[in-house]
Amino acid sequence: MIDYASSASLSRMLYGEDLIDWIIKNRPGITTERQSDGPVTFPSPLYPRTRNVLIVRAPMGSGKTTALMNWLQCILCNSNMSVLIVSCRRSFTNTLSEKINRAGMSGFCTYLSSSDYIMRGREFSRLLVQIESLHRVDSKLLDNYDIVILDEIMSTIGQLFSPTMKHLCQVDNILTSLLRYRPKIVAMDATINTQLIDMLAIMRGEENIHVIVGEYAASGFSRRSCTILRSLGTNILLSVMNEFKQLPSHTQPIFKQSTGVNGSLDISLHDRTFFSELTRRLEGGLNICLFSSTISFSEIVARFCLAYTDSVLVLNSTRNTPIDINSWSNYRVVIYTTVVTVGLSFNDSHFHSMFAYIKPTINGPEMVSVYQSLGRIRSLRLNEVLIYIDASGAGSEPVFTPMLLNHVIANGGGWPTRFSQVTNMLCHNFRRDCIPTFRAADALYIFPRFKYKHLFERCTLNNVSDSINILHALLESNLIHVRFDGCDLQLNAEAFCDFLVILRADSITAQRDMKTLRKNATCPLPVEVDVIDSDAVACFVQKYLRPTVLANDLTELLTKLAEPITREQFINITMLEACRATPAALYSEAVFCRIYDYYASGNIPIIGPSGTLDTTILTCDFNTSGRWDLYRVCCKWAELLGINPLEGPNADIDPTKLLHVMKDDYDIYARSVLEIARCYLIDAQTALKRPVRATKCALSGIQNSHHSQPSTQSHAVSLFKVTWEILFGLRLTKSTTTFPGRTKVKNLRKAEIEALLDGAGIDRTSCKTHKDLYTLLMKSKSLFRNMRYDIRRPKWYDLLRSRLDKELGIYHDLVDLESVLAEIPSALWPRVEGAVDFHRL
């Protein structure tokens, strides 16, 4: 892992800025070449002194893939050399295959054409394969490929961290062997960085590597200007959508609101918002491409655009529309999410302007994926991109503190020392805390070397300023000029922080406005969907749910399970309950792994946006050790705090007790949350320092006056609140009751009042009757005014199978686990006395 000192330069260095300077200083045996006068060109592969490992870092639109095709044609001319091309996406595989066929190169096929699981034989000697399927290539083929090509290598390596990577160890070992031993390697990407160069230098030797750094980008990028807007303008959205709904059906979808001159919206020229700018261009007859990082906004903005034209195409994961990029010129408006990414490029000069709505959230796409999707449109007639970054999904809690400073301001010496000292310290701490993560993968070669970059990209999504700074650095690396709306003069620290304050306030207001519209973003679910007759649903109910679940409740749950975040929370709470039902799982990793494999793998039914019953695959996390650590700590905390979420709402969590309970296990918990939830938590000692708090407020758009003085106790509450909502969907809220417990005070029994008085240390020896005890309790109200918290749970928790038999009032084992646990050899069960109930076994 390479250490970066400056929080202002970290994002640029992780994406390959100053690459040649680093190579000259640290790897002088590598030859380098700057190309700035035109599209990228490769050295001739036929030249005897050409080095066998070629690394190309160049912006999007610099001609990398064209140069690769020319290089391949040259080296394969009158040759039987074998070629393996490893890609990161199926769409990218298909696009490269089409380009190879158009270039007239014969003998190539894709992994999609294989009828057998294992690809073997001469027909696969020139193969295009997605990295997730690399283990399906026969070892004899892998050991004999002459050329290995990794276009978009950083994205390809990033797939090692994807939930779709089911065979991580095999794939990592195969890719390591290919990079180390195959005769010729070509690696290309717009964000190749020093980590990759350093790894390949160790594997192949500096004397065998040549690096090309392209500094040219096609005019479609180099002339492009990007403006980051500070307001979404939902007042215009609501105005148009409300009128649109009231129109007769025969007049839809074309609409002109006649509140202004010439039947157009009355928008002030000074009203520069996302929707005002979009409205002007739609009314002006311009063609628009629009990227959205969320599905819901893509549907909302599609309905907005339909008010002006019926020529609208929407591409997201909930629609079955095939991605035919050649048809885009038939539409005035094309709206897409990250389903359109590397490997797909629209080259026609059809669209005038690009708009982008980006919402950084812990479960959303990282900024590199956003950047890749923005680059799919190669030419814009007006060379303008307007971006709105929704800050409402980023964390404002003290456990999430921004780590990065904007590099443009830093280059001008504009960041005060009080900011840079704090963020540099946080970057150092983050690097330190990444080192012990993913211990289960330490034996691998590639995965551990890039875990820091992966965790950095995921964890920074909790902070809007970090996300903005990363995107800013990526866009500038592609020679795109970036400006901030309202900051027309030189961007400085004060203007940047003011921008964040306005952006966060606008985002919160905008989210309230869009809540009413989001319900209609997708097709409504038919009530008559018959899920009860499905065998798959019946098996699902038997495995996870109470047998008395009602059809309407089941339908609602299956609809929610179509969302990845709900599926993750569903498995987490199921595992928490299973571990508490089987205490041996808390002491034996083998027992835990068997239970986890049972609940976190296989197919489960879902109801998609179309309202039809479907299935999705659950994939176990390879990092079972990290999961084991996390669930053990959560089980311990739940036991000590009296949290039983499947048994009903839980009340009266005392923050003092919470702090005491969390103290001993904080380090293990923080590391586990970083590994499993990709969520980096700032410890209390760091978070409570005055400079850190000031930096947090300034770079998060939070005004100091609105927040009380924090403490270790409030930090513990914040940490628990944030992480348990992410992991389990449980919400921690301030209790509004006077006394602990959910029973109304007038309904308290004598024993319950005695317990309350004893818990508060109140002497009740003189009180014998219920009336006397009640009077004493009411006189002692002031002693119960300490802050307490309730835990609110999702409605679907009522459907899950629990250890508690409510009718009998007893706890019991989950019966369906008996056959699963019977497969575990007795030697793997814990030997600690008291850990196993031998009667149950």
Curated annotation (Swiss-Prot):
Belongs to the herpesviridae OriBP family. Homodimer. Interacts with the major DNA-binding protein. Interacts with the DNA helicase/primase complex-associated protein and the polymerase accessory protein. It holds the Pfam family Herpes_ori_bp. PROSITE patterns: HELICASE_ATP_BIND_1 (PS51192). Residues 45-210 form the Helicase ATP-binding domain. Functions as a docking protein to recruit essential components of the viral replication machinery to viral DNA origins. In the presence of the major DNA-binding protein, opens dsDNA leading to a conformational change in the origin that facilitates DNA unwinding and subsequent replication. SMART domains: AAA, DEXDc. Gene3D superfamilies: P-loop containing nucleotide triphosphate hydrolases. It comes from the Viruses. Keywords: ATP-binding, DNA replication, DNA-binding, Host nucleus, Nucleotide-binding. One of its GO terms (biological process) is DNA replication. The keyword Lipid metabolism does not apply. This is Replication origin-binding protein. The keyword ATP-binding applies. ATP binds at A58, P59, M60, G61, S62, G63, K64, T65. It is found in: Host nucleus.
